[in-house]
Amino acid sequence: MGEGHKKLNFSDCMGLAIGQIIGSGIMVLTGIVIGLTGHGIAAAFILGAVLAVITCVPFIILTSAIPSSGAGFTYIRRLMGEKAGFMYIAMFVLSQVLIATYAKGFASYFCSIFPQFGESAVAMAALVICTAINLIGLKSSALVQKGMVVLLLLSLFLFIVFGLPKVSWDALTPTVSNLMPNGPKNFFTGVALLSFACGGAKFVAENGDDIVEPSRTIPKVIVLSTSIVAVFYVLIGIVAGGVLPVETVAFQNLTLVAQEIFPTWLYLFFVFGGAVFALLTTLNGTLSWVTRGLQAAAKQGWLPEKTAEENRNGVPAILLMVFFLMGAIPILTGMDLTLISNMGVGTDMVTEFMVLLACWRLPDIFPEEYQKSAFCMKKRTLHILLFFIGILIIGTSYVNLSDLTVPAAIACGIYILVMFVYTQVRYPYVKAKQEKKEDK
């Protein structure tokens, strides 16, 4: 956004943040978390929102001191170096197994109406079609994306309005056996997954250069928008887990509850207008932007320059195929939604920890900017705060990644090791290329 453009104010950022948080992921994750937490899903949503805000604290501190577009990747590079920056991108790529959740989520809702189709085949078809659409440059228009948000919000609002009167409130008594029927570990795994569903506001920081008073606006927006959406989500959780027996809805999508509370015409609107359309546009929209960070890394020399080249439609086709594979592999290997979600959220938490390490170095690398920031505190106080947040992030990542199957865990380990070795080998070339560019 150039200087001649109007900058984003507080209300603009609130709208952007709420739109980022309220996504179709809620359609996929709610049933999974009911399976993990039972009637504890409402409490899990509350704690998930709190966790989402807490893990944003390093982002908040960084944006208050050195607001910058590109946020996470930019902060890692500036505060931890080029190698760490590429490892951040590598972990981001791994976390995008979450692309498969949109395709599989779409398939689960679609097949609830058309059971004659196989879910894996429908999921792959959706992924192939959305990839093809992006390859020819037909990205979803802003109007379509806004329409998706409106339909999704309306569907979820109707879900709450029609569902609350039918909730069996006696079943929601807050006892330990009710909140953690499957034990503390499964409960906190659910909290970790829902923190991802409640996340999204931090991406406002990606527009740091284009926001009025970013050091004050961004932190307020992150906390307030997350809190507002959390209330909305808690009500959804109460309906999803309180209308039918938990055993019936555990690890299922929301169609079972929707059938119970809606007349037929509203049920069809909920499935198609809310779930199917939202998941498909989210999948398509994700594929339209997900290559940006990796393309930037390729242009810096981390990947062969050819991979950064765009086709005649302005799309980095080779890099798009990387993310197509990240979505296709979980579908073709039969990974279930819980496993995919745990892998994606667990590795996403690793990137959060890298941002925290960057924040740790902030007072030393940018002392003047830090002193002038709205959240300046004594260096020792900052480090104590980040230490406890770091423990929380590591714990969250652990509860997700510890549930991986042995093959999935081995695959992740090999990927990370290969990326680490590749970073060491490739760095001299990247450094030489940057020095050559500076000499010109």
Language-model regions: role of each:
Residues I32-G35, A44, I54-L135, V271-A296, ...:
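Hydrophobic transmembrane alpha-helices that form the core helical bundles
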Residues I26-T30, Y102-F106, I133-K139, V246-E247, ...:
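Transmembrane helix-loop junctions in multi-pass membrane proteins
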Residues V144, K306-A317, E352-V406, Y429-K440:
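C-terminal membrane-solvent junction of multi-pass transporters and transport-like membrane proteins
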Residues M1-G31, L36-G40, A52-V53, V57, ...:
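Membrane-interface "cap" regions at the ends of multi-pass membrane proteins
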Residues Y109, E119-W169, P181-N182, I222-S227, ...:
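Membrane-interface loop-to-helix entry segments
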Residues E3, A42, P115-G118, K146-L268:
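Helix-loop-helix junctions that connect adjacent transmembrane segments
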Residues T74-I76, G81, S112, V223-N284, ...:
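TM-loop-TM module centered on a large, flexible mid-protein loop between adjacent transmembrane helices
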Residues K6-A17, G81-L94, A125-A126, P181-L194, ...:
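Select transmembrane alpha-helical segments in multipass membrane proteins
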